Amino acid sequence: VGLNGVGIKAVNALSESFEIQSFRDGETKYVRYCRAKIVEERKIEPTDQPNGTQVTFFADKDIFGNYHYIAEYLEAMVKNYVFLNTGLTIFFNDHKYYSKRGLYDLLMENMSGEGLYPIIHLKGEDIEMAMTHGRQYGEEYYSFVNGQHTTQGGTHLSAFREAVAKTIRDFYKKDFEISDIRTSIIGAISIKVQEPVFESQTKTKLGSKDIRPDGPTVRNFIMDFVTRELDNYLHRNPDTAELLLRKIVETEKERKAMSGVQKIARERAKQVSLHNRKLRDCRVHFNSNHERKNESSIFITEGDSASGSITKSRDV
């Protein structure tokens, strides 16, 4: 995944030993290569193994020298594979990786603490989503297309974020601020797209507009699914719906309180400190909310004595 269709060719060419064995419909075929040249090839034989492909390779030491694999990087990839393929088992460094609940397990793996309500996990044909809210600031998403981790998002993630916010607004029949809904959200979305188009060679951002030729758009496909399934879930789980509502209301209160603090700070910043002793600031600013702001005036005097008396006698 992520090598733009040349992955197996590149690995074969850069391996001192590359073995591949395919199992299909009760038959198997085995071929072994050395630096992309066939050194052993067996005839098709009967087998009782399930369908699949086994690949074994050793990187060419003449090219890579005393190489080693970065276990943390491979482990992250392996985990994503099992999260996206429920029931798949992968063994890596004598450790078994397996997931029964797909994206639900992915969120559990990546959350720094418990969610504020149980993870909402929904699956459909060619689509799966999971979401909850945590205690962190900002938004956190994991998006996938055909098993590819789109770290930069794309059309599917944009549609997912829009659909979740719209569904929650409609469910509670309240015109919440979008930011209040999304703050602290942790979500994951995975879809399958025919002939996906990515915006870069690294396949980290989906650019596809449609799910398949002559099919719905990515946006409509995700909007329809989330609107229907998330709304149904919230109706069936009133306790979760109540916790979600409480979270949004608390975020709204925090935002308004913070907005008030910021407003006061801005108003204080406008009250410029005048270092020139010839200039005296007025008591009431014209751009303030004071009831006598329209009485504020500018006085220009010739000398310090006149200025001093006016400054002391004014009340605006």
Cite the ranges covered by each PLM segment:
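Glycine-rich phosphate-binding loop
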Residues: 1
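Hydrophobic Leu site in an alpha-helix of the histidine kinase catalytic ATPase core
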Residues: 4-8
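GHKL-family ATPase ATP-binding module
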Residues: 9-13, 17-316
